[in-house]
Amino acid sequence: MSARLVEEAALDWVCAHRDRFALGEDALAADGQVNGTWKPLGELAQVCASVSVATAPSDPLHARVTELLDFAWQQTHKGEMFPLMQSLEPFATYPLEVYAAFASAGYRHPGYEASAAVVARTRGWRLTEQYPTRRLGVIEAERRSGLRPHGKVPQALDRTWLGGLPEPWTFERAAGYALTHVVFHLTEWGRTPQGVPPDLADYLRHWLPPWLDTCLEARMWDLSCELLAVAASLPSPPEPAVLEDAWQRVAAAQHACGAIPEEGSAQDAAPPGQDDPYAFTDCYHSTLMAVFAAALTTARPTEAEHAGQGVPG
């Protein structure tokens, strides 16, 4: 099965479960669970924004992700909820990170951007303690939202796991998710492959294939799809055979309903014979990542010739 067919089936599932991404009454609650409200909505917005750029306006998938973006924006009351979130949590960065996904697709709220710019100038904002990858993401969120970034990308990149070009054998789950998001931030979610510095691009060209194979073998479908998105975001992607094999394995993991579970354990626990066997939280992110990775892969055909001879690391 091709990446395109995986994408179409996965997007079918997302559209069928659109209402599960809707914000509930707890979206602004003091004890609300951000990971169950704003996180899924923000991830939906980011994936749809990226896919809308990667697909031609004449492509039926383009219209579908645009409709999903409109739905997601309506959930924020056309941006009115972002100033409310800021008033409740002035120094929380997740509202800006979610907003940046919308802003990158042209959905803007000038009032929120003005107030966010004021907060971003404070020492309290600049000194918020964060993991290095998150810091890089906030800097990029500021830029995409029209704010002046509070730091510089090269310095932020140097503090990340990937930026240090670590020994390849130190790769594990947490490092995998960190490196994928570093690449997403550097390339504006796959839009600008040249945003990956040459040394990182060369390093990933050599080590991404074995890491991807390891994750696929372990049935870590969510991380595997993120790594496939990284592969499609590099200046020079991996060998075609690597990607073809990976997509075949992802396709084999995809349920007939279009959903892809985050982990193989969800497949093992799924009751047989059900049309939609996975809990939303067990599959929504990996299914979104499959849409994202497939769109980038389809939009940017793998190069037949690859540069680079040495093996870094």
Predicted features along the sequence, with ranges:
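Terminal, non-catalytic domain-edge segments
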Residues: 1-57, 116-123, 160, 235-313
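N-terminal entry module detector
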Residues: 26-104
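Intrinsically disordered, low-complexity segments enriched in charged and polar residues
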Residues: 1, 15-17, 29-30, 59-70, ...
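Eukaryote-skewed repeat-based solenoidal scaffolds used as protein-protein interaction platforms
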Residues: 73-222, 232-234, 247, 251
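Amphipathic alpha-helical protein-interaction segments enriched in hydrophobic
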Residues: 218-229, 283-288
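Short beta-strand elements that form the blades of beta-propeller/WD-repeat-like
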Residues: 44-45, 138-139, 183-185, 227, ...
